[in-house]
């Protein structure tokens, strides 16, 4: 049952998919955290895998950069492969002084400067929020594992190299915890097609101080975020 962007057969994906932006991070997650892993798709080198975590079938697949890219993959996974839950596991930038590099953020909502959701929602503002039960499970997973995690709003930007640097002051005033490029789109796609979604991000760089992690570190570490995501799936299963 291939789509234009996914060449996996029917039934290849689990009902829960972790989605990093980087397909190599998807490969890392599959090889490091999952057992009995099988690669199920590789169109455009956007790798997807299915395996098990503590006996629970889970998939992981990259979604690329930006709302247009992640929206394509999220939509096809939900409508063509029956995926019920998507957990974005990605990086973000910080603007607040009290948010530090490598902090983990659970995105309960996502503001955006993108017009994608206005197009989808007939020129009205859509409140892009995570699924409550998934958010609660992630918070519980973080506490059980002793991992400090913040919960709050993300900002999904259309431009990585923004000309409007003063907007960072506004974000800080409004308490934005992290700036990334996808969560608002994934939340809206999930809402449109009756699925559930959550974004968990690790701060990879601080926009104010200039402190940053390397591309290799972003690809091969950030294990706390991944652990929270995987453990939250198990907690969610018990709650259902």
UniProtKB/Swiss-Prot annotation:
A purine D-ribonucleoside binds at residues 5, 180-182, 204-205. InterPro entries: DeoD-type, Nucleoside_phosphorylase_CS, Nucleoside_phosphorylase_d, Nucleoside_phosphorylase_sf. Belongs to the PNP/UDP phosphorylase family. This is Purine nucleoside phosphorylase DeoD-type. Phosphate binds at residues 21, 25, 44, 88-91. Homohexamer; trimer of homodimers. It comes from Actinobacillus pleuropneumoniae serotype 3 (strain JL03). GO terms for cellular component: cytosol. The record marks 218 as: Important for catalytic activity.
């Amino acid at each position: 049952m291939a789509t234009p962007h996914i060449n996996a057969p029917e039934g290849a994906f689990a009902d829960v998919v972790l989605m990093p932006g980087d397909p190599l991070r998807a490969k890392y997650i599959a090889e490091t955290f999952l057992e009995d892993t099988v690669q199920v798709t590789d169109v455009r080198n956007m790798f997807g895998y299915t395996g098990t975590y503590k006996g629970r079938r889970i998939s992981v697949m990259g979604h690329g950069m930006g709302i247009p890219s992640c929206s394509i993959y999220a939509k096809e996974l939900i409508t063509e492969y029956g995926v019920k839950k998507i957990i974005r596991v990605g990086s973000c930038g910080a603007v607040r002084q009290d948010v530090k590099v490598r902090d983990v953020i659970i995105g309960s909502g996502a503001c955006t400067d993108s017009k994608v959701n206005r197009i989808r929602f007939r020129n009205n503002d859509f409140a892009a929020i995570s699924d409550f039960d998934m958010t609660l499970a992630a918070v519980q997973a973080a506490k059980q594992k002793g991992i400090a995690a913040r919960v709050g709003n993300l900002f999904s930007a259309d431009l990585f190299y923004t000309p409007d640097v003063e907007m960072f002051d506004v974000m800080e005033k409004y308490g934005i915890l992290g700036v990334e490029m996808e969560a608002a789109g994934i939340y809206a796609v999930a809402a449109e097609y009756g699925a559930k979604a959550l974004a968990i991000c690790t701060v990879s760089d601080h926009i104010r101080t200039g402190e940053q992690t390397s591309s290799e570190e972003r690809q091969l570490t950030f294990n706390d975020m991944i652990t929270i995501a995987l453990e939250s799936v198990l907690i969610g299963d018990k709650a259902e």
